[in-house]
Amino acid sequence: MKASLLKKIYLSPLGMPIHLIQAFIGRVFRPFMVYGYYDKSQKRFRKYTRISSTALLSDNEHISIGDNCWIWHHSILDGSNGIRIGKGVQIGAWVGIFTHSSHIAIRLHGDNYLQVDRDDRVGYVRGSVTIGDYTFIGAGAKILPGVEIGSGCVISAGAMVTRDVPDHSIAAGSPAKVIGSTIDLDRGYLEIDGIREQYFNQDAV
């Protein structure tokens, strides 16, 4: 009853002040799931999105996160070259999403690395990352620059995603490879009363 009342209050116009209070508490008492996220890139408040107080979102003005998302503890989102996360995405703990890498440039420039402007560094890898609606990213997965992951996917725990992943794929391993389909995984559940009508992609079923 108490939890239900708190939920109703949060979903009222008081949602933003409650979010700000939770965010403050989360910085003092970590880890803590903070309800609500202000999407700077879209200038919209995502009331149903929940992000851990220990998650690090760098350059978050270049990070777009849809509503109903979940980002768990100690995950890192490098927004320097843009991240777009669709609605309903869940991201496990210790996940890394990277949009740049200096793994080539540091050798090419040697001791001059810091003296060279980032935009002028040879071998400096950049690429935005996109994650489609209702995709699940397992704990410890790493997503590298330039990758596009489709909708309705499952990225297994510990996977290293180096290339694009099509819609409804299950990907695992390092480097990650497609090992199955979430359509096949979900098919048995679609016979449960009311589930087929709620399925996120009606065209797929």
Cite the ranges covered by each PLM segment.
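Extended beta-solenoid/beta-helix repeat architectures
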Residues: 49, 69-71, 148-150, 165
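Short beta-to-alpha loop/turn elements within the nucleotide-binding domains of ABC transporters
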Residues: 147, 158-159, 165, 174
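A generic "structured core" feature
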Residues: 154-156
